[in-house]
């Protein structure tokens, strides 16, 4: 399912413990680490897709998490040109994503990376909230910065500002225009501080 602009609808998952640490996983047979994410099926809502991807990639069920909030609408990133398959009938140039923040309420024994026959990840660990912005593959850094910035007030309301804190300067540079990692829909000016209101409205354009 690819939209007229060439973007595939997708969901991303930030799974967070009560202390503000987030789930960070290594892709199978690769050195790259990332958050769980995956494409939406045509008959799914973003929330339905999120719970399906959560189970497929981590083995977790809805009773193992609490949904804290989501980004308002789509956040986009472009694929590097080497990853774009130009010979396909519908050319996908990137992903448009809704990102969800989940509190992990289960036990670590519930995490099962081999839940499916084709696992996405082979190793995982807990990292600081902003760590992924500086360590994910370069072309995703902008969308990670934007997603975590939207979700940070919700994370702070659970873990506290000392655990989550403000976006570090190096992570902020990925969000600002002019950065090579800024992404498809980066802002035109420095972002303003937002309040902690929960962002649950999702625009299915």
Swiss-Prot record:
Cofactor names: a divalent metal cation
Alphabetically ordered keywords of this record: Hydrolase
Family classification: Belongs to the Nudix hydrolase family. RppH subfamily.
Entries under HAMAP family matching the protein: Nudix_RppH (MF_00298)
EC number: 3.6.1.-
Pfam family name, one: NUDIX
Enzyme kind, highest EC tier: hydrolase
Biased composition regions of type Basic residues, renumbered to the chain: 187-196
Lineage: Bacteria, Pseudomonadati, Pseudomonadota, Gammaproteobacteria, Lysobacterales
Organism: Xanthomonas axonopodis pv. citri (strain 306)
Name of the protein described by the UniProt record: RNA pyrophosphohydrolase
């Amino acid at each position: 399912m690819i939209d007229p602009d060439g973007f595939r609808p997708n969901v991303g998952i930030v799974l967070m413990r009560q202390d503000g640490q987030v789930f960070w996983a290594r892709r199978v047979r690769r050195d790259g680490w990332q958050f769980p994410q995956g494409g939406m099926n045509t008959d799914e809502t973003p929330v339905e897709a999120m719970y399906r991807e959560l189970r497929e990639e981590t083995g977790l069920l809805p009773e193992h998490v609490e949904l804290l909030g989501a980004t308002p609408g789509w956040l986009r990133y472009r694929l590097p040109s080497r990853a774009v398959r130009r010979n396909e009938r519908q050319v996908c140039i990137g992903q448009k994503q809704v990102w969800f923040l989940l509190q992990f309420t289960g036990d670590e024994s519930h995490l099962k990376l081999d839940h499916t026959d084709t696992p996405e990840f082979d190793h995982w660990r807990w990292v600081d909230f902003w760590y992924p912005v500086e360590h994910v593959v370069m072309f995703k850094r902008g969308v990670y910065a934007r997603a975590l910035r939207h979700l940070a007030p919700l994370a702070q309301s659970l873990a506290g500002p000392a655990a989550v804190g403000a976006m570090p300067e190096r992570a902020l540079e990925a969000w600002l225009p002019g950065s090579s990692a800024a992404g498809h829909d980066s802002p035109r000016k420095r972002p303003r501080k937002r309040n902690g209101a929960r962002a649950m409205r999702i625009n299915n354009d």
